[in-house]
Structure formats: structure tokens, C-alpha cells
């Protein structure tokens, strides 16, 4: 969908730009013809033709060129708006948040193929990044947890991570990041648990609701809140197994990144499908510019003014 809109903007900008150039050429011709003082009826005829050209339908279209051009430049190279469709980044980002993504955070990229034209900064640990999924090309948003060369270990029961930086096949982790977790506190977020009402027609009803616990995760000096569900774990076979590595341990390859959602038990991320190549990065999420009170697949019921601002 995003690529379709980009192609539409590019095509519209090009088409209206051509009409805009033609229109201005005709205006210039008209200006010089009007300056000429001649008794030749041909001049009058030419002026009439030019006046008719000015009233042509394409002149109305050509007037849209500046708008298409500005929107295309801003959206492709400066800031692009995105909507948060799911709860995988709760509590940092909620369903109904509309965010701005800084497109030039990690370089200037060609808007259609996403190939880097000018390379700039590299992603930092803790950045919230929009990227293309490495397999299905869908836009995702997650937090950068692992950088190239990191060894990531995930504790499936305690819901905690260990990170060894600049790992080069050593048996013991010599450069381990200092990671701490606060005591879990009950949050206002909950997940509905469904029970089959009838196995014949597969009707469902709400059986119970489990509230998430909020934990502050601090990686060196970077801290953010995450959500966990006590007593609920994914099957170990659901996790991505890197070639030559045991389950739940990954070594981040060169020019790739390990992404995780802040809603740890409701996020399909690098733990399940692997690493994100650098060329798939679209930009860094920086601000919430609008936030609607809504649930997934439902209409908004209000506006969350207090959520508008910077993203951390």
C-alpha cells in the first residue's frame, strides 16, 4: 500500500510537472505576442488560440504540481506519517497513534526501491524504527535491541535478555551490557482470553481477561517500559533458530539488526523471524502527531491529546 502511494505521488508529480512547464511556456509566448504591435490579423488569431490554451483542462491539472511536488519531497526524504495498527509496541505506542518517521535518520534513500543514495547515521540501540519485513515486505515498527556483532540471549521464562557486544566466538562473554529490570507492576493494559463455546460451530466467548505487568527495562543508560504476561510463554519451537546456534541465542550478522516489540508477549519480531537488513530500514519514529482512542479493527471513540509529543 505504501509503495502504491509513493508511485502515485511520483507519477502525479511528473505528469502535472510536464503540464506546468507547458502552461508556463504558453504564458511566456502570450506575453511576448502581446508586446508586439502589429496590424496582422494572424497575431490576433494566435492570441486567441493562446487564450484558449490557458482555459484548457490541463491548466487546472498543472496548478496541482507544486502541491504534489512538495508532498512527494517531504514524504519521501524528510518525514512520513504512519499509523500504529497493533499493540506490539505497547506501552510506548498504542493502537490509534499516528506517528512521524524521520526518513533521513539513517541516510537518503530512493523512495521506490529504498536503495541508499547517501549514507548517514547508523541505528542506535533503543531506536524505534520503521522497516520493511525481510520476508513479506510489510512495514513493521519495533525497537532496536541488537546491533551487528551482538550476541543476544532470551530467557523465555523470565522474559529477560542478555546482550554481549562485539562477540567473536569467545566462550565467555567479555563485553556484557549492564541490563536491569524493575519489579513488575500491574498495568492498565489487558488481554482477552477466549474459550470455545461450541467445538462444532467454533463460536467464541470471552472467558477471562489477563492484565499485563509493566516492567522498566534498562540497557546501560537507556530505559523504557515493556509489558509482559506472567505464566504465558510461546513454544520454544516457534522461535527463529539461527544456523549453527542453539535456540533462543542469536549472533547479529554484519549490516543487520535485531528488533523486538515492547509488548514482549504480543510481538512478532526478530525472535520469531530473524534479522532486519540495513537496507530495509525506512526511518526513525520521532513524534506522535495525533492519537485516537481506539481498539484494533474498531472505529475511534475519542482523541488522546496527552499522547501527542516526542517518542521515547
From Swiss-Prot:
Cellular component GO terms, alphabetical: plasma membrane
Entry membrane topology: Multi-pass membrane protein
One matching Pfam family: Peptidase_S26
Topology, Cytoplasmic side: 28-63
EC number: 3.4.21.89
Ranges of the Extracellular topological domain: 85-312
GO biological process: signal peptide processing
Stated family: Belongs to the peptidase S26 family.
Protein name per the record: Signal peptidase I
Organism: Buchnera aphidicola subsp. Schizaphis graminum (strain Sg)
Amino acid at each position: 500500500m505504501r509503495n502504491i502511494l509513493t508511485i502515485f505521488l511520483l507519477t502525479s508529480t511528473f505528469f502535472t510537472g510536464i503540464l506546468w512547464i507547458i502552461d508556463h511556456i504558453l504564458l511566456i509566448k502570450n506575453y511576448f505576442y502581446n508586446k508586439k504591435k502589429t496590424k496582422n490579423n494572424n497575431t490576433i488569431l494566435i492570441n486567441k488560440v493562446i487564450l484558449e490554451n490557458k482555459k484548457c483542462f490541463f491548466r487546472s491539472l498543472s496548478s496541482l504540481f507544486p502541491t504534489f511536488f512538495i508532498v512527494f519531497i517531504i514524504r519521501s526524504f524528510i518525514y512520513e506519517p504512519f499509523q500504529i495498527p497493533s499493540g506490539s509496541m505497547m506501552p510506548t505506542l498504542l493502537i490509534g497513534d499516528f506517528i512521524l518517521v524521520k526518513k533521513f535518520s539513517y541516510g537518503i534513500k530512493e523512495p521506490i526501491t529504498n536503495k541508499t543514495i547517501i549514507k548517514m547515521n547508523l541505528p542506535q540501540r533503543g531506536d524505534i524504527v520503521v522497516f520493511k519485513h525481510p520476508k513479506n515486505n510489510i512495514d513493521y515498527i519495533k525497537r532496536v535491541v541488537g546491533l551487528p556483532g551482538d550476541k543476544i540471549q532470551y530467557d523465555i521464562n523470565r522474559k529477560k535478555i542478555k546482550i554481549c557486544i562485539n562477540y567473536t566466538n569467545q566462550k565467555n562473554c567479555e563485553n556484557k551490557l549492564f541490563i536491569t529490570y524493575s519489579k513488575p507492576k500491574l498495568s492498565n493494559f489487558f488481554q482477552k482470553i477466549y474459550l470455545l463455546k461450541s467445538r462444532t460451530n467454533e463460536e467464541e466467548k470471552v472467558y477471562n481477561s489477563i492484565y499485563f505487568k509493566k516492567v522498566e527495562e534498562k540497557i546501560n543508560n537507556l530505559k523504557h517500559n515493556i509489558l509482559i504476561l506472567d505464566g504465558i510463554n510461546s513454544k520454544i519451537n516457534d522461535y527463529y533458530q539461527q544456523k549453527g546456534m542453539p535456540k533462543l541465542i542469536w549472533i547479529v550478522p554484519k549490516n543487520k539488526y535485531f528488533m523486538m516489540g515492547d509488548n514482549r508477549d504480543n510481538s512478532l519480531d526478530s525472535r520469531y523471524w530473524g534479522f532486519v537488513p540495513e537496507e530495509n530500514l525506512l526511518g526513525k519514529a520521532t513524534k506522535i502527531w495525533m492519537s485516537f482512542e481506539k481498539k484494533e479493527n474498531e472505529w475511534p471513540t475519542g482523541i488522546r491529546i496527552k499522547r501527542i509529543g516526542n517518542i521515547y
